[in-house]
Regions:
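N-terminal export signals
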Residues: 1-15
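Accessory terminal and edge-of-domain segments that mediate assembly/interaction
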Residues: 18-323
Length: 323
């Protein structure tokens, strides 16, 4: 197991300027990272998380915890907010997170593939950067992408090493042992569904039955949509994982989470669990511009709920290992 039995002691919120004895530090077993109010509220409705509230400098919301040392916070949207939050948690004098499992739990954009119903949940095996490299308009006036130059991210002779490189954050492979545990823990969960989601599934001609799957998530701060960008996302994931992973969902925070953890040697303590709220291409008969004018089609509430269901199953399994 990645952590042993953990003690839990109440602390006054602000002894940050003073050295805190190691025995007095709070040691969360799990910290769930949410991005924005609907994801946060999907957890805060559970009164168990009012057992302890810790105000951590650098966080936009407090760290709220239950009696089993499982905590939740809201990071804000995007890679920068995610990285600032995770760094603040790791460096806070009142916390010891050396054995904590960090789980990003929230919604994501999915793909228009038959088996990827809205409300499905991906336990991600890779976290990939959308932004690095070169996004441009080709001579044929098509959206295009090329990878960063080798000297931008790698030491000489290691141009193919996109993973955990020393100069840019391009790709992180999730700890296989932690990933397998999460997949096994959620193998028999019952996901919810909704009439709204089923209608959208029919619109996109995809499955109407949400399921738990494994795939790669790509992280970027800009909201994009369309077949051209989808093809670029697929290209990036293939390149950075050497064909090992398949692009299945897109979100805004995960790379910031795991890159920050990596700086402290904690990248192997990270999971990304994402519920599919929308599809990354317009519905048939609609253009990208029409979507910007009218708004995308979402099943956000279902995606949030199912992400929580899977995350709770994973947490329950983790806690069994510390009993």
């Amino acid at each position: 197991m990645l952590y042993g039995a953990v003690g839990f002691s109440l602390m006054t919120p602000l002894a940050y300027a003073q050295a805190i004895p190691a025995a007095a530090k709070m040691r969360p077993k799990v910290i769930v990272l949410t991005a924005f109010p609907p994801e946060w509220q999907a957890w805060t409705v559970e009164k168990s998380f009012q057992h302890q509230v810790l105000h951590v400098p650098g966080l936009i919301k407090p760290l709220i915890c239950d009696s089993k040392d499982v905590c939740v916070t809201e990071t804000g949207e995007g890679e920068i907010n995610a990285a600032v939050t995770v760094t603040s948690l790791v460096k806070d004098a009142a916390l010891d997170v050396k054995k904590t499992i960090f789980i990003r739990s929230g919604i994501a954009g999915g793909v228009d593939e038959e088996n990827s119903a809205l409300g499905s949940v991906y336990i991600n095996n890779w976290v990939i950067s959308w932004a690095f490299g070169h996004h441009y308009l080709s001579d044929q006036k098509q959206l295009a992408w090329s990878p960063p130059g080798c000297t931008d991210y790698a030491t000489p002779g290691h141009c193919g090493n996109y993973t955990r490189n020393i100069m840019e954050n391009l790709a992180y492979k999730i700890n296989p042992a932690l990933l397998n545990m999460a997949v096994n823990a959620s193998a028999h969960v019952a996901l919810e569904n909704s009439t709204e989601a089923k209608k959208l599934d029919k619109t996109f001609a995809i499955s109407a039955v949400p399921k738990v799957m494994v795939g790669a998530t790509i992280t970027g701060n800009d909201f994009w949509i369309g077949k051209a960008n989808q093809a670029i996302a697929e290209q990036i994931v293939r390149r950075y994982t050497h064909g090992e992973a398949k692009y299945t969902n897109t979100a805004m925070e995960d790379l910031g989470d795991v890159a920050a953890l990596s700086r402290f040697g904690l990248a192997d303590h990270y999971l990304s669990i994402r519920g599919i709220s929308d599809v990354d291409v317009p519905p048939p008969g609609k253009t990208e511009e029409e979507i910007w004018k009218t708004g995308d089609l979402y099943a956000s509430a279902l995606a949030e709920r199912n992400a929580v269901i899977v995350t709770e199953a994973v947490i329950a399994h983790l806690l069994k290992g510390t009993a």
